[in-house]
Amino acid sequence: MELTAVPATQFSSVQLTDILNACFEAYLVPVTQSVEGFVQRFSAEGMSLVDSRVWLAGDEPAAIAIVARRGSAARLAAFALRPAWRGKGLGRKLMQELLMLLQQQGIETVFLEVIRDNHAAVALYQSLGFTRRYGLCGYLSTELLPRCRAYYSFIPPCPCFGAPLRRVTASFPGCWIRLPSPLCHVRS
């Protein structure tokens, strides 16, 4: 059966959360989001519902891609297929389709993270031209983590705000998550 790509704008937060949870069923690690967690996480990361996709088999969701966007850079915040659709070469086809769409929308750079032991996903992303840049480690702490180091530069005043904007450039793509606020802020 052919899958149909549908922009995430066509779904509610509740539906997207349910689809994400279904697509991550039987994943390497448990992935379950509440609606509130979904909205908080992906909103903070700059989720673009316009660029994000759900692939349908008839009326049934088969796959999802959550894309966060900042200017001409995008981050694949989540990409998963429901278990019944895995291992059929669809991940490659859907990723090629998504990357082509992002390129048409002016995206020049795409970042993503993948669990090192997810050999199928690592092979998929490498076959699409992605290269390993950083190793990420996951930790859980009850203490506050130090802020992400970032570099600040000032750019000319924005006529909309009548004040200079401060552009924050993360020191490495992992700061996208640790510093999920927008890259430009009005300077007070």
State each model region's role.
Residues L102-E113:
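Conserved GNAT acetyl-CoA-binding A-motif
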Residues W85, G89-E97:
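Conserved acetyl-CoA pyrophosphate-binding loop and the N-cap/start of the following alpha-helix
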Residues A62, A120, T131-R133:
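Short hydrophobic beta-strand segments in globular cytosolic domains
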Residues L20, L28-I66, R167-S188:
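Active-site rim helix/loop that mediates acceptor-substrate recognition in acyltransferases
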Residues E2-D18, A150-F172:
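A short beta-loop-alpha structural element at the N-terminal edge
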Residues R82, L112-A121, Y139-E143:
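Conserved beta-strand-loop-alpha-helix junction that forms the acyl-donor binding cleft
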Residues A68, S72-A84:
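Conserved acetyl-CoA binding element of GNAT-fold acetyltransferases
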Residues Y125, F130:
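Conserved active-site tyrosine of GNAT-family acetyltransferases
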